[in-house]
């Protein structure tokens, strides 16, 4: 099987009530996913990025058979998500986050046994599988504690174990490290990338809020905005597609907005992003463009002439975040 997931023209429309008019209620039509097309190769770790409301979670829900598409088709493991739902669910693991989906008054082990029985797993096989999963996610020593005593990171580990209870070859993850501290996030990324993908050969599709996480983990990435894909490829391919040669990060004191427009008018400059003021009153200007090395002196000179103090600057190659900002726009959260 070359492609584990195939999506063709997938569309989902929601109708929301806006208020009352003569003759009844007015319905606002929101196209959450608009004729989406992509494939996820077998054994691949595929990332889906985009602003809030772009359609990431809606896509995950359609692929997991929770939502029915209004148009288009998708297959998971060769099975249709609209015509072969039970076959899709048998080979698919779905891992979300947060506090829902677990029984807090049960132990971690008992939670996993409950979900194993939903898959009609024999108790002996389930116990062996649970022991293996608890070891995989690092919860063996706390397996018999009540979930209500777990930290958020431990609950997220249990979510991962729950989604893998039936050993699915294909796994969907919706923001698996959201809101976790850096140490816990790093541990979970290692579980996902090393243990699940590399060692067990699972196909993984995930959404994430963190650009650097996607850049370091994903084999390929699709950026979605307004329900449609605007860029897709490896992290390097996406960075190359927006033709951002380099970026310059300058830490400065307060500056007039006219400075930003003046810098953007310089040759080779594509975009200037102000990353906001810190508590000490300083700001960071991120300048994206081509051959910026020759612009350093003119930019510094411009800032000084406008009474702006330059505290530091750093030039580097563009990151996935730089490409994302160029494609989606400044201020578009993911």
Where do the model's predicted regions map?
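Conserved catalytic motifs of ABC-family nucleotide-binding domains
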Residues: 167
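Catalytic Walker B motif of ABC-type/P-loop ATPase nucleotide-binding domains
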Residues: 171-175
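ABC transporter nucleotide-binding domain
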Residues: 191-290
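Conserved ABC ATPase "signature" region
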Residues: 113, 117, 124-142
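Hydrophobic anchor residue at the start of the ABC signature
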Residues: 160
């Amino acid at each position: 099987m070359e492609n584990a997931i195939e999506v063709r023209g997938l569309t989902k429309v929601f109708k929301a009530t806006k208020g009352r008019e003569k003759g009844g209620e007015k319905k606002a039509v929101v196209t959450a996913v608009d004729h989406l097309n992509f494939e996820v190769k077998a054994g691949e770790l595929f990332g889906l990025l985009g602003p809030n409301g772009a359609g990431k979670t809606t896509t995950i829900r359609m692929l997991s058979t929770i939502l029915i598409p209004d148009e288009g088709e998708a297959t998971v493991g060769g099975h249709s998500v609209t015509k072969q739902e039970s076959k899709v669910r048998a080979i698919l693991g779905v891992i979300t986050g947060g506090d829902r989906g677990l029984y807090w008054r049960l132990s971690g082990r008992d939670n996993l046994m409950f979900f194993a029985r939903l898959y009609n797993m024999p108790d002996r096989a389930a116990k062996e599988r649970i022991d293996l999963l608890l070891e995989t996610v690092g919860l063996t020593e706390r397996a018999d504690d009540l979930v209500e005593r777990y930290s958020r990171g431990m609950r997220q580990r249990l979510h991962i174990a729950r989604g893998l209870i039936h050993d699915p070859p294909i796994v969907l993850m919706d923001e698996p490290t959201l809101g976790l501290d850096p140490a816990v996030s790093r541990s979970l990324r290692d579980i996902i990338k090393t243990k699940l993908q590399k060692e067990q050969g699972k196909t993984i599709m995930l959404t994430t809020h963190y650009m650097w996480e996607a850049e370091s983990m994903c084999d390929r990435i699709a950026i979605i905005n307004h329900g449609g894909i605007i860029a897709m490829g490896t992290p390097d391919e996406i960075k190359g597609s927006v033709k951002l040669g380099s970026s310059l990060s300058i830490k400065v004191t307060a500056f007039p907005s006219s400075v930003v427009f003046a810098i953007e008018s310089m040759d080779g400059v594509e975009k200037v992003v102000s990353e906001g003021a810190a508590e000490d009153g300083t700001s960071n200007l991120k300048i994206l463009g081509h051959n910026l090395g020759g612009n350093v002196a003119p930019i510094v000179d411009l800032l000084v002439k406008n009474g702006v103090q330059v505290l530091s600057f750093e030039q580097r190659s563009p990151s996935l975040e730089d490409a994302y900002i160029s494609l989606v726009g400044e201020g578009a959260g993911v």
